[in-house]
Amino acid sequence: MEIKVLHFVPQWPKQENAAVLFDLFLQKIGEEAEVHVATMSPVKESSGENFRKYCIGSGKADYGKHGIVNLLALQKRFLTLLYQLMPQVVHIHGSYHFINSRIALWSRKRGFPVVFSPYGGMNPEFIDQEYGMRTWKLLSYQKKMVRNASCTLISDPHEGDYIKEEKLSERIAFIEDPTKEEHTQLDDYADCTLQVYQKVLDTDMGKRIDRQSQEAVSALLHLSLAGDVERQPLCSEDILNLRSITPKKWRDIFLYAAEQGVTGYINDGIARAQLAVPETDAGTADHFPLRYPKDTRSLTSDKLLTPNLISRKAIERKLRHTRGAERTLCTMLHNLRYHVGQSSLSLRHLCDLYEVLRHTPLDEDALDIHLREQRIHTFTRRICQVLHEAAYLDEGFMPVAALDDKGTEKIRASLTKY
């Protein structure tokens, strides 16, 4: 599938050699991807051989504290272009430009992954030499861009060392600068850049998976967890949806399942549905480390995970009055609440809870009392709502009535927070 990329260059290179080289780079990228370039330089909007330029503002305009009107106008033009093109990746070029930080913020807040190329701007020697010309605020913007970017693309190893030492980001990709290294050709540079784009798209799949694929995941989890061999637990719409999934979406599903620790359940659901699924490279696909790694191990049911000693002792005192399956379930719920707070909640944890609720006999009256005493009754109602959405848990297996409110939304957000 062809990747669509929107490049943002605040100022078009003024030196002829640099401008020609950048044009060649964009053309090489355009041979394998759909490339669009936005700039603030007064260039005519034009279509090159493999890319198209757009002028969205004037580089001479004031965008500082006295230029709020200009900044709002620029934001409107950029967002109009962004939603018109709907790129898969936004690639920002250049260092120490206030507008770069705004472009990154506007893109990231709307769910578009951002790749940032500082071109030596994060080299500590450059920072020391140029700091007198840079305000502390501009340096802060620069560091924040690196911290929040889906990937920082560097060509200077000293930049990478500085970024790691400052603990700004672990999402770094190093590619030799073709203008400095004789053995690095422009073709290789473009190929490596495309690989970085794909690596970015293969990371944080929970943020990018579409609704059809999400519904397919829920159906497959339900099919695997229900364990009902006497009847088909899926409706005709779910079956039709599963049979209409494209190979590209199957790849996304397996990437998402790997992030959430439910690949085994997905494979079991596929086998039960007798689906013919194409082979994918999802198992070997390269990706960047997650900012909030998901705990893909089984949900602990025999001990509390809360590190706070006082809180743990208080919960343990209340658990003493709970026995058997009810005690196991209450412990799992306390640990689920801990994972939500740590942003490490995964579908694997919800699957473990689903199996207990579905296949373990529970005294619902006694359980209701225990949940209220331990102050997790409302949390349990919210978890039941999320389980109903994520794996189609039937109301008959819910120990309490489901609740959909702002607290439930926080649990959903924890699942997709990377």
Regions found by a protein language model. Give the residues of each.
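N-terminal subdomain of nucleotide-sugar transferases
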Residues: 1-44, 187-191
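Conserved NTP-donor binding/palm subdomain of two-metal-ion nucleotidyltransferases/polymerases, i.e.
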Residues: 203-418
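An aromatic- and histidine-rich active-site surface loop
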Residues: 90-118, 122-123
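Nucleotide-sugar donor phosphate/pyrophosphate-binding loop at the beta->alpha transition
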Residues: 113-115, 123-144
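Membrane-proximal helix-turn-helix segments that form the acceptor-binding/catalytic region
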Residues: 24, 109, 135-151
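A short, active-site helix/loop in glycosyltransferases that binds the activated sugar's phosphate group
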Residues: 147-170, 189
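C-terminal alpha-helical cap of glycosyltransferases
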Residues: 175, 179, 183-209
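A short, charged, and often flexible helix/loop element on the N-terminal side
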Residues: 49-77, 129-134
